[in-house]
């Protein structure tokens, strides 16, 4: 099947356990398409911009029970453990983080069944955070008189609920720079 697209040798995708079945990112589906076409995959965002390293306490406790490394370790090993992954790009901001990443990638082993169950438990915790259900289809955006990028703002709110960090504030500012803010909504109902 790789002969279908001979000009493409490798594909780089955002791939991590939080985005695997996320309707906006669709990391799992992107990965499956790469594999269907026989393409090697380079992973970016295995720790989702640091969000999967700084988990809420209930999610962090799941990995702590395993006694096998930091949340970032599990996130990177999750991404690296899939067939066809040729490289995992992980941003690091300290020498300590680099040493940690090198230590478990040097003698790499994919997540075992117990660890995969822990990842799924963390994903269940994320899903239980009373998130705004949005597929990111963007149908609601077309009729908005205030040009509010509704799915992007929902994604920011969901990220804030899950990860409790300020990255979502940065993305909110990015998405509202040339579009309406949530507070600009006039409740016209065209998005319904």
Where are these regions (language model features)?
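Beta/alpha (TIM)-barrel catalytic core signal, keyed to glycine-rich beta->alpha loops juxtaposed to Asp/Glu
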Residues: 1-135, 139-148, 152-155, 167, ...
